[in-house]
Amino acid sequence: MPYIYMNITLAFVISLIGTLMYRSHLMSSLLCLEGMMLSLFTLNALLSLNMNFTLSTTVPLILLVFAACEAAVGLALLIMISNTYGLDYVQNLNLLQC
């Protein structure tokens, strides 16, 4: 395995471990999720360039669109929780149910 793929995979694993360790705060979880999406985007972009398959070049762009949507929804939840309760704990998400 080339070193660049190993580094990107290591970045994904470190972000996953960060998500598991800091799951009580929403902001930390969102940052770790963004790190995971960035490493997946980089890995998909490198793989699509190396495969020389023209249809696979749209996959990283679709992943980037989903990452932007995930960030927007996450930040909206973070703002709503922090305005309502003043904290960014994930435990407060259960209180937002109707």
Swiss-Prot record:
Q: What is its EC number?
A: 7.1.1.2
**Keyword tRNA-binding applies:** no
Which GO cellular component terms, listed alphabetically, does the Swiss-Prot or TrEMBL entry include?
mitochondrial inner membrane; respiratory chain complex I
Membrane topology recorded in Swiss-Prot or TrEMBL: Multi-pass membrane protein
Listed A to Z, the keywords are:
Electron transport, Extinct organism protein, Membrane, Mitochondrion, Mitochondrion inner membrane, NAD, Respiratory chain, Translocase, Transmembrane, Transmembrane helix, Transport, Ubiquinone
Q: Which GO terms describe its molecular function?
A: NADH dehydrogenase (ubiquinone) activity
Q: Quote the catalytic activity from the record.
A: a ubiquinone + NADH + 5 H(+)(in) = a ubiquinol + NAD(+) + 4 H(+)(out)
- TM regions (residue ranges): 1-21, 29-49, 61-81
The record, for Pfam families, names: Oxidored_q2 (PF00420)
> Where does it reside?
Mitochondrion inner membrane
Offer one example of a GO biological process linked to this entry.
ATP synthesis coupled electron transport
Q: Does the keyword field hold Membrane?
A: yes
Q: What class of enzyme is it?
A: translocase
Give the family per the record. Belongs to the complex I subunit 4L family.
What is this protein's function? Answer: Core subunit of the mitochondrial membrane respiratory chain NADH dehydrogenase (Complex I) which catalyzes electron transfer from NADH through the respiratory chain, using ubiquinone as an electron acceptor. Part of the enzyme membrane arm which is embedded in the lipid bilayer and involved in proton translocation.
Q: How does it assemble?
A: Core subunit of respiratory chain NADH dehydrogenase (Complex I) which is composed of 45 different subunits.
Designated name of the protein: NADH-ubiquinone oxidoreductase chain 4L
The major lineage groups are: Eukaryota, Metazoa, Chordata, Craniata, Vertebrata
